[in-house]
Amino acid sequence: MTSDELLELLNYIQKTKCETKNLEIKAAEYGCPTKLYDTLSGFANQDEGGRIVFGVDEKNDYRECGVYDPQDIQQKINDQCHQMEPVVRPLLTVAEKGGKTFVSAEIPGDDLAVRPCFYQGAGRLTG
């Protein structure tokens, strides 16, 4: 995804004000969500994968709040992706809009041969 595509996706989110089976929205205004594992495994276990957009507050009428620190959140997303089995390799994109910074993580769907993708800390059956 390019920065322009992320900006288009932000506009789409403002129009629809909803998530979909391949789109998850996280505020991340004050820090990176600490447990992305369910979302990461859910998207990795779908053929088409999915996208997580950070910087939109779903609980506040989809307010565009931006992220606290684009460099740090990318590192923390990657750290959580490395705790998955198989390791999730997100495509990260950063875009600016209205003086705020937004980050998206595209999570590719895993091949059937390596599924299920799961959180290593919980194990194959519960992660």
State where each predicted segment sits.
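Conserved N-terminal catalytic/coupling substructures associated with nucleotide/phosphate chemistry
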Residues: M1-G127
